[in-house]
Amino acid sequence: MLTHKTCQARKKMQVSFVIRDAEEKQHRNGVNALQLDANNGKLYSAGRDAIIRVWNTRTDSSEKYIQSMEHHNDWVNDIVLCCNGRNLISASCDTTVKVWNAQKGFCMSTLRTHRDYVQALAYAKDREQVASAGLDKAIFLWDVNTLTALTASNNTVTTSSLTGSKDSIYSLAMNPSGTVIVSGSTENILRIWDPRTCMRSMKLRGHTENVRCLVVSPDGNQVVSGSSDGTIKVWNLGQQRCVQTIHVHKEGVWSLLMSENFQYIVSGSRDRNIIVTEMRNPSNKTLVCEEQAPVLSLGYNIDKTGVWATTWNSDIRCWKLPMYDRCTMNSSGGMDAQWTQGGTEVACIKGGAAIKECAVLNDKRYIITKDSQDQVVVYDVLRVVKKEQLGAVDYEAEVKKRNKQVYIPNWFTVDLKTGMPTIVLGQEEVDCFSAWVSIEAGLPECVDPTTEIKINYGKLLLEALLEYWTPPHSIPPNEMEPDMHGNGYFQVPKHTPVIFSEVGGRTVCRLLVRDAAGDSESTLLHETAPQWVTDVVIEKNIPKFLKIPFFLQPHPQMTKPERTKKDRLVANEFIQCRKVCEHVLEKVLNAETTPSGGNANNSLQNSQSDANSEGSQLPAEERIELWCNDVVVDPNMDLRTVRHFIWKQSTDLTFQYKTKQNFNYDGSIGDSLERVTRKY
């Protein structure tokens, strides 16, 4: 027996998992941020598929993948390299900031200070200080050396906060010496703080929409901002005003890079264009390239002759930057540069396809998806695997073809935000224990023809996901009883990520199926797993059956109009209509369901006995016909399927029964029917 910690104030929890390959070498969605370690040529990319990947940009090979860094479970919005490339800090929509060993690729610690999506990070290299900000309007300052020293026992960290923001923060920047920090938000203004004192020094107005990207000059005197209003603005902090507005894009500016001398701007936009502009002379500009989708992030290559770009798509491309042949002084005192040809794609890190559409089949075990490359795939939710790759076929036609006329309650939801199928189990709008099915229908590959077992999809799946969890402080099993782990029918892939999170909120715990056996993971599960999970996984409790009330009455052909009184019955919703036929035959009509025996006294009695014996050997569904809404019901249908597809009303389901034409009752049976009808 396990004593599980309970708390009345604990928030409602859900469990989710991702159906994926053991190693996902390609991004499966857009890439939000880039960081290059120029010392070794490693490029770090933060994906909307919740994975940070590391690439070798020094190789000419198409295989640039080095490793994946996995511990987030939602979009990774920003990353910064620190400590000379030894560590990496990441910010995510899962509301966490994580500290990584950049060389070995593992998560060292998780910071849960933010209460909403963490959108942006800023880094002061000279002070080894990082700032984080997000949709909770909060900005926190972190000492990197303290973060990288955190351990399981030394896990307390203090942070300074910068207050005053009145709306969601989408951009953040610091200068290397850490004397200035700037934030941009949906207030459409820039707020400036001194991170040394945590005091706000000014706010700057001028943009008319969200401020999406920021760069601070090394001396802390200038700020360049890009906004959803399509403009780039240059701000002088000493004068506390905008000194220049640059119009080179037709849509929002989402990413900015500055040259080392802070004279040239490389900008990426929602209009898909990447443009180089001279800051003092904005008319001196050139188009680097037009990407295939809105540009999310930019980063220089090692020698700064090119720029890496990411978009809504999963590819990462490096484009050659135009060079300057010669410069001449123009009438305004600026330099007119003669641009060489740029825009050549010099490298490409290919991404994978993101799932864009999903249909849950009526059997509530399989889903069919369509991705950004029009590939259609069938997934087995129960076994957590890809079942069938159908190729570029007609998606709607496949869904229609594979949908059976069966109704099973929804017991999971599907989230496609990361580009991979994430299955969510909970107890709120969709009850993960609502799907009871016969083992013959739900697991035909495990059928024992001698049994009529009913299985619960949600229970089986949770038992498989947490098969390796052995709770701490649990009483050892009786030696005479087997130590039951898993569900006894199947296992799920051991690499499957399992996430425990608050409903509509923060992530509490993430682990792989195979890691649940670890001491720390087991303890964490004990502390965070909701009671409804431990009830079925640890306590082995059986989820309750859902019942359906229904009426049963003779068909008009079976009795006189005044003898149509209805019986009101209640049964488990998953029982098949053949069971209702048996009830009618045995309890209502009082007919024999086994061959009758005994001696006959004359030839008439013998013939009647033979006829009854022959008829009683037939299954009930071959002797009784059920009708609903003037439709003959398939005896293999269950009650919930009849209610959903045939009855289609909010009132109680109603059946009418009658005997089949090839099976006739004698007068005595008719008398029995009349008596039973009166009785009921």
Curated annotation (Swiss-Prot):
Keywords: Repeat, Ubl conjugation pathway, WD repeat
Repeat among keywords: yes
Signal sequence coordinates: none
Keyword Protein transport among record annotations: no
InterPro entries named among the record's database cross-references: G-protein_beta_WD-40_rep, WD40/YVTN_repeat-like_dom_sf, WD40_repeat_CS, WD40_repeat_dom_sf, WD40_rpt, WDR48, WDR48/Bun107
Region described as Disordered: 592-616
CDD domains, per the entry: Ubl_WDR48, WD40
Each WD repeat, start to end: 26-65, 71-110, 113-152, 164-203, 206-245, 248-287, 290-329, 350-389
S-S bonds: none
GO molecular function: ubiquitin binding
Pfam families associated with the record: DUF3337 (PF11816), WD40 (PF00400)
BP GO terms, sorted: double-strand break repair via homologous recombination
Family per record: Belongs to the WD repeat WDR48 family.
Assembly and oligomerization: Catalytic component of the Usp12-46 deubiquitylase complex consisting of Usp12-46, Wdr20 and Uaf1; regulatory subunit that, together wtih Wdr20, stabilizes Usp12-46. The Usp12-46 deubiquitylase complex associates with arr/arrow; the interaction leads to deubiquitination and stabilization of arr/arrow.
General function of this protein: Regulatory component of the Usp12-46 deubiquitylase complex. activates deubiquitination by increasing the catalytic turnover without increasing the affinity of deubiquitinating enzymes for the substrate. The complex deubiquitylates the wg/wingless-signaling receptor arr/arrow, which stabilizes the receptor and increases its concentration at the cell surface; this enhances the sensitivity of cells to wg/wingless-signal stimulation.
Protein name: WD repeat-containing protein 48 homolog
Species assigned in the record: Drosophila yakuba
Designated gene of the protein: Uaf1
